[in-house]
């Protein structure tokens, strides 16, 4: 079933353990070489008299490693192997010994380029999901912090972690989210979180507002968890999805958590006013220019008195396209 000869990175290593033929299967690049060397070296000293009768006893007595399990279902074995774990088959055993000594190519947890902060920690999420969960677990050492792992995608089988505080989260929201996740049937999360977001909240009408807040900072995600929100982590993505969210959440920044209350309120109010001005100033300007009699005398100086060859609405559209093109 496994294309060992066709795929160069799928490795099969045959050895003899206690007089029984055995085979290691693992993916090159996903396994810690030094750990595998120590495990295989320990098997060379096993004699026939020391060989247990079952795979469970073998994993408990002879495998010198912490994360060890046994699997008998073929689909589960294939899924674990393709996820990076090492599978050991021993002649005469009905189950496979699964050794989780995998490692992933990963960069350092440096500060995010697009989500910097003047104060606070300088670490950020990376593309490896277990590193991201560890960064949040380090900040919230509470048994109520739940990180539920699931898989989405028939081909990709992408790991998705649902993180929440079970004593603070809205249970109805959590139930609705789990129900939506179970109904997702896609071949793969090609664009990771963006694909997941589109599958979670499908709408038949156009909504320009974002449905999630994204952050690449573990401290921001941890703060949202403590507020009772849900954080979704997707493997191969260096950002977290936060829900529920609102327009007020979109004008928050990481610096807000580290400034005094007065400064925090001032910055949020400033961003809110700027957001409102961005939405309403341009259409109001167009409205008053087309109806000068409505323009208050205080703002009479902004009136366009010269004749223009291009209508104002087209001027604004050209300006918008020029700004977007830069």
Predicted regions and their residues:
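Membrane-embedded alpha-helical signal segments
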Residues: 1-280, 294
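Core alpha-helical transmembrane segments of integral membrane proteins
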Residues: 261-325
